Amino acid sequence: MDYLKQQNKRNRGLEVDEDEILATNKNVIVIGGGDTANDCVGTAIRQGAKNVYQLQRSSESERDSKGASFWGKISAMTKNPVFEEGGIREYSVKPTAFSGEAGIVNKLHAIKLDENREEIADSDFEIECDLALFALGFLHPEHETLLGDLGVELDERGNVKTDEFKRTSVKGVYAAGDMRSGQSLVCKAISDRKSVV
């Protein structure tokens, strides 16, 4: 994500060569609910954004009901320190459109969702938006590549299914990191390699 890459350059005292993306004095909307979205929220707050909103489709109850299989692994997000710095997290929201003038965005249009992720009638709303950041991650690794050619078994989320030693359903083929667990932190991927046998 260019926004975070640029800030990492600034943090190291390096020059940002491309057009700068800054949140200073802006109404910022971050779309997505994972670690990258949280990093965007924190960065925008620290850059002096006027307002920062994080929007995600999932509900708080949906997150809690998934258990350790997925949301349990990221339950720490509910008490994420970045939101102690500021920012507003909105659950069960579906962005529907952006609007603006002369090619410049100034509003996000959205609608609230029910527990089945269906739109709630007459729940449309707008948020002022000067900068929109999409931190949506990915659903699963691409299946139409080597994974498909090898015929490895996939789990219910479309990730490569493994046992506790990271062995796939194909003898001699192992999987670690995001392709096995879904999008996560690089340190977890590095840790995965230690249990490959």
Language model features by range: what are they?
Residues 196-197:
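Conserved small/polar residues in nucleotide/adenosyl-binding loops
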Residues 1-25, 116-183:
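FAD-site-proximal beta/loop scaffold in flavoenzymes
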Residues 38-97:
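Rossmann-like dinucleotide-binding cores of NAD(P)H-dependent redox enzymes
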Residues 34-38, 179-180:
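Residue-level detector of alpha-helix initiation sites
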Residues 23-34:
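Beta1/beta-strand and adjacent pyrophosphate-binding region of the FAD-binding site
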Residues 17-19, 81-88, 92-130:
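A structured beta-alpha segment of the ubiquitous adenosine-cofactor-binding alpha/beta core
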